[in-house]
Amino acid sequence: MKKPQKDQMWVFNKDIEGEQASEGVVRKVLAYCDGMMCVENQFEKGAVGNLHSHPHTQITYVASGKFEFTIGDEKKVVEAGDSLLKQNGITHGCVCLEKGILVDIFTPMREDFL
């Protein structure tokens, strides 16, 4: 299975194929419905999540690794166990300082990821 179906109750990570989101970043769309979406992003050290904004509210959980995040005008280093809130429309991005995984929850779902 490459990507799960909308409203799929059970999604097993091992069954999902990742796709290259950018250099050094592999994205896996996990469970989702119209109202929200869970996405795993695997970052290599030095990979960049370019500054961007979108009309979705986003919560990021740092599952592993270390990242320097920019949200609006603030820049902070976060590591495993930390979480971040990015309101819709705010500019944000990151640089991976130590190889790691970010888990993002978006509301509503990101149709552009399907």
Segments predicted by a language model, with ranges:
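Short acidic-glycine-tyrosine-enriched beta hairpin
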Residues: 74-88
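Glycine- and acidic-residue-biased ligand/ion/polar-headgroup-sensing regions
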Residues: 56-67
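A short, N-terminal "cap"/entry segment at the start of jelly-roll beta-barrel domains
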Residues: 1-35
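Ligand-binding loop in jelly-roll beta-barrel domains
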Residues: 88-112
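Conserved short histidine dyad/triad with adjacent acidic residue
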Residues: 37-53
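A cytosolic small-molecule/anion-sensing beta-strand core signal
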Residues: 63-64, 79-80, 98
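Histidine-centered metal-chelating micro-motifs
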Residues: 48-49, 68, 84, 88-93
